[in-house]
């Protein structure tokens, strides 16, 4: 009877010994440097309501209302250079390739032609102003996250993905002496389905020459 008890005892212990042999060592490395978990990068948000209040005709014109922007590189009526009709937003007074433009938090390809200085940039005119939901502007360098094209900051454009219906906007504006005029047409339409949706946006801007 004693021999049988010893055999049962060994059988019960054997699985426990095997399980313990598979345990791996875990090493946790920490830092003693004090920091605040509430620290955040400075981000400006421009909503759809802000766009209506600014009364702007295209995305590039938003740069006139950003405190961290050096303006937009806009050459609609230029007579020289290779990038007429294109536009880019630059932050902190740096060149065009130092500000990263994201469309719905995703990268986009550069414009087909470089700037007059040979720099590659994203043409913001590809984004219909009427389809923009809001814009997020990161006002400091983010090269550790996005690379060297985010030295000056990041501009993230969010579009109206869930728009349903039809929207048409026509605008005609002139200078005080009628020497220059802007005519714009904006179209936005969308519909939601059971398994998805679609949104179509279009902006057309015709700007006449400014008489000196």
Language model: regions and residue ranges:
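Cleavable N-terminal targeting peptides that direct proteins into the secretory/outer-membrane pathway or into
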Residues: 1-22
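Extracytoplasmic beta-strand/coil segments of soluble accessory domains associated
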Residues: 35, 64-107
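N-terminal periplasmic "start-of-domain" segments of outer-membrane beta-barrel proteins
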Residues: 25-54, 60, 111-116, 166
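N-terminal periplasmic accessory domains that precede
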Residues: 59-62, 66, 89-90, 104, ...
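Structural signature of outer-membrane beta-barrel domains
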Residues: 33, 68, 108, 173-175, ...
């Amino acid at each position: 009877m004693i021999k049988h008890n010893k055999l049962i005892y060994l059988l019960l212990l054997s699985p426990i010994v095997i399980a313990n042999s598979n345990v791996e060592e875990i090493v946790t490395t920490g830092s003693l440097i004090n920091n605040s978990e509430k620290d955040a990068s400075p981000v400006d948000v421009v909503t759809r309501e802000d766009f209506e209040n600014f009364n702007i005709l295209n995305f590039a014109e938003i740069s006139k209302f950003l405190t961290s922007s050096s303006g937009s590189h806009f050459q609609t009526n230029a007579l020289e250079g290779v990038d007429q009709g294109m536009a880019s937003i630059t932050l902190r007074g740096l060149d065009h390739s130092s500000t990263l433009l994201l469309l719905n938090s995703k990268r986009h390809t550069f414009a087909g032609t470089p700037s007059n200085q040979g720099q590659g940039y994203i043409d913001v005119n590809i984004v219909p102003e009427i389809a923009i939901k809001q814009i997020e502007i990161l006002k400091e360098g983010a090269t550790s996250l996005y690379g060297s094209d985010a030295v000056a900051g990041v501009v993230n454009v969010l579009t109206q993905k869930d728009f349903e219906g039809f929207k048409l906007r026509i605008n005609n504006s002139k200078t005080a002496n009628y020497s220059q005029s802007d005519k714009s047409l904006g179209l936005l339409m969308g519909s939601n389905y059971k398994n998805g949706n679609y949104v179509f946006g279009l902006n057309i801007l015709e700007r006449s020459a400014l008489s000196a």
